[in-house]
């Protein structure tokens, strides 16, 4: 090997070592703060995890209680948002993938959906407040909170359904249509079965996303310190209670806020891991 080649080889090795070192430092830097956040969350939230947390409602200041009404309110609004947003999102994603795939309208719809996907959640909350809450006499309710969350669910489900259906091999469509079955039956019995894992993953990711939303609920659900299951009345939610209690001067409320944050983090982690595992187990071959 000539002197010039040796010099070039050493230079490339030096650059490669420097790049690897910088990459490792950057990864460790991000990992350090992630571990720090998780450790703080566990150390401050774990002491408040007990049976009362899940069975008692939010207490007055300086008294013991739990977050049962907040858990119930969050569950009701998230369930309503998923029930309303999922069928609409799947239908819209199906139209994009199967009926309007090459049309100019589908390009516009995808563009608008991408904008909605990245829109600040507080804007969606203000939109529902103006469109629905103000026109119902200014009544805050779990239903209006669910409507705000629907606008977060929709773009996720639409994007996931569109992409998963387009990943299904074209030979499956041709084989089904060659048997003489109508297109709607081909979509429901062939394409949906093939893309079911990916679509379900999108729904789970949407659930994980809306479970921690606070901003849109400030203008819609408003909150309620009592036990309530009426969807047309103000209702508590875990993110709203956490936001209120974390900024309070009372130690008991702060402990409940940390405990609620820990429970919410574990829930989102489990849902995200479940969605990832489901997608990896049922991955559609890209052919």
Swiss-Prot record:
Cellular compartments annotated: Cell inner membrane
Domain ABC transmembrane type-1 residues, every copy: 71-279
GO CC terms: plasma membrane
InterPro entries: MetI-like, MetI-like_sf, Phosphate_PstA, Phosphate_transprt_permease
Main location: membrane
UniProt keyword terms in alphabetical order: Cell inner membrane, Cell membrane, Membrane, Phosphate transport, Transmembrane, Transmembrane helix, Transport
Gene Ontology biological process terms in this record: phosphate ion transmembrane transport
Lineage: superkingdom: Bacteria
Transmembrane segments: 22-42, 70-90, 115-135, 138-158, 199-219, 255-275
Membrane topology: Multi-pass membrane protein
Family assignment from sequence similarity: Belongs to the binding-protein-dependent transport system permease family. CysTW subfamily.
Protein role: Part of a binding-protein-dependent transport system for phosphate; probably responsible for the translocation of the substrate across the membrane.
PANTHER family: PHOSPHATE TRANSPORT SYSTEM PERMEASE PROTEIN PSTA
Protein name according to UniProt: Phosphate transport system permease protein PstA
Organism: Xylella fastidiosa (strain Temecula1 / ATCC 700964)
Gene that encodes the chain: pstA
